Amino acid sequence: MARQNRFDRTSFQTQIIDLSHDGRGVARPHGEGDKVTFVTGALPGEVVIVEPVARNRHFDEARVVEVLQASPQRVIPRCSHFGVCSGCVLQHLAEDAQVVSKQRVLLESLERIGRVSPERVLPALAAESWGYRRKGRFSVRWVEKKGRTLVGFREHDPRFVADVSVCHTVVPQVGEKIALLATLLNSLDGRRDVPQIEFIAGDAVVALTVRHLQPLSEADRLALIEFGKEHGIAIFLQSGGVESVRLLWPDEVLLAFRLKPWDVEFVFRPLDFIQINGGLNEKMIAHALDLLGAGFGERVLDLFCGLGNFTLPLARTVDEVVGVEGDIGLVERARENARRNGLGNAEFFVADLTRDQRDAPWMRQGFDKLLLDPPRSGAIEVLKQLPLKMFERIVYVSCHPGSLARDADFLVNEQGFVLRAVGAMDMFPHTAHVESIAVFDRC
């Protein structure tokens, strides 16, 4: 017997009343007291016809079939793959409205989760919104039914790879060559054994890292080399973990970017973490250092420091700065970059900041101010261990408003800090990702 549908999929008309944190429209088709329906492709204020796609206990899900009354903030997406590819979810919303939405998500999270409100809301930071993505990972899949290789980000259904030919958010040296890259991979003997390709761009060099599950034939290696030569792209191969990455072409390459305002250059490896949006990154660093207000005569602690993205610029402006990071490879590069830039007042330590660090040597040092840039999970574990009373000011750079709100609750409502200011930063235009910065002062 054929399985019956579990719910009615009949399309219906509804009005969109809000935008969710993940970029979907919010409707209450059965009235204020009923559960919400999240509608993919809809914007606040619109009247739409939607098709139900899923039903859950606390909410339903649907997609737009037709827009009957469009929002004045609706725009035509630049990308023909929008709506299928999960790389972007907000291309149909005007750019200034995207930033306003992210600022709202940030403030609502602080109030709802953290039970805090800032004394001041900072103007949102924004930079170039197209061709900004200088690091990322494409999924690769040989599809037997299509008889060819697909290269792209995942579809909204993560089981599938979006069949894209170009990506306007990726740096043009890569984003405009996706179709050529797919053709190259399709020609390889080992096309079934390449699950992903990572890209990263420095100031002068763009690199691709080809992950392969089986050794590549000599013909495949030559094909990759020719692609690199033709398009001026460095090619790395990865047969296993991070330590297995090897340069295929050219014989030597230097991946680097420079932060001109502080005259520091960062050398990095192809799988290292760097901030995805280079233009916004420079604005963010300047903003963070200005808000921190640290100068000569002061010592600063920089947690989750990575390559030293904030640490090295700070070293130009303060007496001493200590960076702490859990990735030993990033710490090694941070130390080397400090040496290359002649910054003897920057010291780095390796530490898992989710574990007990109360006996760590850096924990026992005295500091005036704290800057931290944790991952999505936030920094609650290390915040609970720090002697917070020694910090006059804390600047917290966040990539997730929920974890920032939780940590703000701890700092303000348990430790007595004041949330002086907070603001969104549009590190990932056309996505629902919310980067932000917050300033806490000791009372």
UniProtKB/Swiss-Prot annotation:
CDD domains: AdoMet_MTases. The keyword Iron-sulfur applies. GO terms for biological process: rRNA base methylation. Keywords: 4Fe-4S, Iron, Iron-sulfur, Metal-binding, Methyltransferase, rRNA processing, S-adenosyl-L-methionine, Transferase. S-adenosyl-L-methionine binds at residues 275, 304, 309, 325, 352, 373. InterPro entries: 23S_rRNA_MeTrfase_RlmD (IPR001566), MeTrfase_TrmA_AS (IPR030390), MeTrfase_TrmA_CS (IPR030391), NA-bd_OB-fold (IPR012340), SAM-dependent_MTases_sf (IPR029063), TRAM_dom (IPR002792), U5_MeTrfase_fam (IPR010280). It is an enzyme of class 2 (transferase). The active site is at 399 (nucleophile). GO terms for molecular function: 4 iron, 4 sulfur cluster binding; iron ion binding; RNA binding; rRNA (uridine-C5-)-methyltransferase activity. Residues 4-66 form the TRAM domain. Its EC number is 2.1.1.190. It catalyses: uridine(1939) in 23S rRNA + S-adenosyl-L-methionine = 5-methyluridine(1939) in 23S rRNA + S-adenosyl-L-homocysteine + H(+). Catalyzes the formation of 5-methyl-uridine at position 1939 (m5U1939) in 23S rRNA. This is 23S rRNA (uracil(1939)-C(5))-methyltransferase RlmD. It comes from Xylella fastidiosa (strain 9a5c). The gene is rlmD.
